[in-house]
Design a protein with these regions (language model features):
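Mixed-charge, glycine-accented linear interaction segment located at domain edges/termini
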Residues: 118-148
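A structural detector for beta-sheet-dominated domains
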Residues: 46, 57, 113-115, 133, ...
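Short solvent-exposed loop/turn micro-motifs enriched in small/polar/acidic residues
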Residues: 35-38, 94-96, 121-124
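Intrinsic disorder/low-complexity detector
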Residues: 1-28, 41-43, 51-107, 148
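Short, basic/aromatic recognition patches
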Residues: 26-31, 101, 111-119
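Short, structured motif recognition centered on aromatic/hydrophobic residues
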Residues: 42-45, 49-54, 128-130, 137-141
Length: 148
């Protein structure tokens, strides 16, 4: 479960590195100690559970091309208030199986999500918007600054 705070998210850029099949945020905000996993994409959190940035393995061979319309989102911080995660560990949020990944090459948008439709949209980190349904993450929208 997540809670929304009115503080502004960190600034930066979300990049895709083709040679590594990975996402990364530059510059990385400091303080990450653990992560939440969606597929193999990690949402880095600090000791207080605040989501800091997105990074991780996301091979473009697994993406399906689609026309996407990213949601209007409020810029805010998200805090994980679910079960405790040990320092250096990850907790998988989509335990029932991998979520589909859709990519819009025109807008450079990725959608990693379940089939559940959310009721809140929070831009919580550089290039990252969480789609929430009753406080649970149902979709991750990513806006790539560049694919290098």
């Amino acid at each position: 479960m997540f809670e929304i705070s009115s503080d502004n998210p960190a600034s930066g850029r979300l990049l895709y590195f083709r040679s590594e099949f990975s996402l990364d945020t530059e510059p990385k905000p400091l303080g990450g100690v653990a992560s939440l996993l969606i597929n193999d994409v990690q949402l880095e959190i600090n000791e207080d559970g605040r989501l800091l940035y997105v990074w991780g393995y996301c091979p473009e061979q697994s993406w399906r091309t689609a026309v996407l319309k990213p949601p209007e989102a409020t810029g805010a911080q998200l805090r994980w208030n679910g079960r405790s995660i040990p320092r250096g560990a990850s907790l998988r949020l989509n335990e029932s199986g991998p979520w589909d990944i859709l990519f819009d090459p025109i807008g450079q948008n990725l959608r990693i999500g379940s089939t559940i439709v959310g009721d809140q949209f929070v831009a919580f980190a550089p290039g990252a918007t969480a789609e929430l349904s009753h406080g649970s993450l149902v979709c991750l929208w990513l806006k790539l600054s560049a694919r290098v």
